[in-house]
């Protein structure tokens, strides 16, 4: 017979084996090589841009580098766009802002997590075997930060093509610049946009580095025609809070109604119980007479206490009637009192 220690060790080994098999069966997520969003980055190939092949669970950091001495700082606004927008280098319609590079004194790092389902309703969501595009139509200067046409997307092909869950060996070089069908544009991503001046300071304690996570961004979603309008986001939040508040009010009203109903039922039950108790107390007073009396006394004779007036008792009994059955006596038992306090009720 196995000892308890051996049983525990066997269960532990089985659990470790199952865990190892699950880890082997599940592809390990990894951090992809960060992308520096700068015109000096040689990874942005002319006419093609930068193509990456992330898997579900991977993470990608897009870095806005700090200003270097002797070189002007490059201002960019990065968008997650549809295939036709990336091909035309246009963000006029439905602009979905990812991050804004507008802080020369610090490095800004934007992290993208490739996940099919996001715990944040404003987070990014990706699907396998789909292409996603990131580009910028800014020209690098502060004055051209808000450009919606051309920019470095057209002049330097600064764009990232993310082929999620796809095999890099199965893609030919001619397919790198092709756009996906427009029917897939609606399923690209649930986008979280960021206004240039609405993001608070998220940098480190030295004030030289800033990390922006896609789950922490706020703004309108990518679906629908109002994704570029900030009012749409606030309206959606107001509608959400209004729905939650209405649900709470309805829940409180139901609780109050049930509480009042329960109190009424308990009060009615208590009143009914008191009435039954009073009836039982009267029935106990009317008890049959015992058979230990004389021979002429019948066992069915009933003794009923005489009602009194003004709490005065009368030690008197009277035979009420015996014409239609057994005689009935009304008897009031009490300790002897002075004759002055005795009243007879006729």
UniProtKB/Swiss-Prot annotation:
State what induces this protein: Up-regulated in response to TNF.
The residues forming the signal peptide are 1-27
Tissue expression pattern: Widely expressed. Detected in both neuronal and non-neuronal tissues. Seems to have particularly strong expression in retina, sciatic nerve, heart and spinal cord.
Residue ranges in the Cytoplasmic topological domain are 259-346
Q: Motif Nuclear localization signal at which residues?
A: 260-273
* GO biological process terms held by the UniProt record: axon guidance; cell adhesion; cell-cell signaling; embryonic pattern specification; ephrin receptor signaling pathway; neural crest cell migration; positive regulation of T cell proliferation; regulation of autophagosome assembly
Q: Is Lyase among the key words of this record?
A: no
**Annotated PROSITE patterns:** EPHRIN_RBD_1, EPHRIN_RBD_2
Keywords for this protein = Cell membrane, Craniosynostosis, Developmental protein, Differentiation, Disease variant, Disulfide bond, Glycoprotein, Membrane, Neurogenesis, Nucleus, Phosphoprotein, Signal, Transmembrane, Transmembrane helix
Q: Sorted alphabetically, which Gene3D superfamilies does this protein's record hold? A: Cupredoxins - blue copper proteins
Return one GO MF term: ephrin receptor binding
Say if the entry is tagged with keyword Mitochondrion. no
Cellular compartments annotated: Cell membrane; Membrane raft
Looking at the UniProt entry, the stretches that span the membrane are 238-258
Q: Which cysteines are joined by disulfide bonds?
A: 64-101, 89-153
Q: Where is the Ephrin RBD domain?
A: 30-164
Q: Where is this region: Disordered?
A: 169-228
Compositional bias (Basic and acidic residues) spans? 205-218
Which residues are tagged as glycosylated in the record? 139
Reported function: Cell surface transmembrane ligand for Eph receptors, a family of receptor tyrosine kinases which are crucial for migration, repulsion and adhesion during neuronal, vascular and epithelial development. Binding to Eph receptors residing on adjacent cells leads to contact-dependent bidirectional signaling into neighboring cells. Shows high affinity for the receptor tyrosine kinase EPHB1/ELK. Can also bind EPHB2 and EPHB3. Binds to, and induces collapse of, commissural axons/growth cones in vitro. May play a role in constraining the orientation of longitudinally projecting axons.
* Description of how the protein assembles with itself and partners: Interacts (via PDZ-binding motif) with GRIP1 and GRIP2 (via PDZ domain 6). Interacts with TLE1. The intracellular domain peptide interacts with ZHX2; the interaction enhances ZHX2 transcriptional repression activity.
Disorder noted:
Craniofrontonasal syndrome: X-linked inherited syndrome characterized by hypertelorism, coronal synostosis with brachycephaly, downslanting palpebral fissures, clefting of the nasal tip, joint anomalies, longitudinally grooved fingernails and other digital anomalies.
Q: What is this protein called?
A: Ephrin-B1
Q: What is the lineage of its organism?
A: Eukaryota, Metazoa, Chordata, Craniata, Vertebrata
């Amino acid at each position: 017979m196995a000892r308890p220690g051996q049983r525990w060790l066997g269960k532990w080994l089985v659990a470790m084996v199952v865990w190892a098999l699950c880890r082997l069966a599940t592809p390990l997520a990894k951090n992809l090589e960060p992308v520096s969003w700068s015109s000096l980055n040689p990874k942005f190939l002319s006419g093609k841009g930068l193509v990456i092949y992330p898997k579900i669970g991977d993470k990608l950091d897009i870095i806005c580098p700090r200003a270097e001495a002797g070189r002007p700082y490059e201002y960019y606004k990065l968008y997650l766009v549809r295939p036709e927008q990336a091909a035309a280098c246009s963000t006029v319609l439905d602009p979905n802002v990812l991050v804004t590079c507008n802080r020369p004194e610090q490095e800004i790092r934007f992290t993208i997590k490739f996940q099919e389902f996001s715990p944040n309703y404003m987070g990014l969501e990706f699907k396998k075997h789909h292409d996603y595009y990131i580009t910028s139509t800014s020209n690098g200067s502060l004055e051209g930060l808000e450009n919606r046409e051309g920019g470095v997307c057209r002049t330097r092909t600064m764009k990232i093509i993310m082929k999620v869950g796809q095999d890099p060996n199965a893609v030919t070089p001619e397919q790198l610049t092709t756009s996906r069908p427009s029917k897939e544009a609606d399923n690209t991503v649930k986008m979280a946009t960021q206004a240039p001046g609405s993001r608070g300071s998220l940098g480190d304690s030295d004030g030289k580095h800033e990390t922006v996570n896609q789950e922490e961004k706020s703004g309108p979603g990518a679906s629908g025609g109002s994704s570029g309008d900030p009012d749409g986001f606030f309206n959606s939040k107001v509608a959400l809070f209004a729905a939650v508040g209405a649900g709470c009010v309805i829940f409180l009203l139901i609780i109050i109604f049930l509480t009042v109903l329960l109190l009424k039922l308990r009060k009615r039950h208590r009143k009914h119980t008191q009435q039954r108790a009073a009836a039982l107390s009267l029935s106990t007073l009317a008890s049959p007479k015992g058979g230990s009396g004389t021979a002429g006394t019948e066992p069915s004779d009933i003794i009923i206490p005489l009602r009194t007036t003004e709490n005065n008792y009368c030690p008197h009994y009277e035979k009420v009637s015996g014409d239609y059955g057994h005689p009935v006596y009304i008897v009031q038992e009490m300790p002897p009192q002075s004759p002055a306090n005795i009243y007879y009720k006729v």
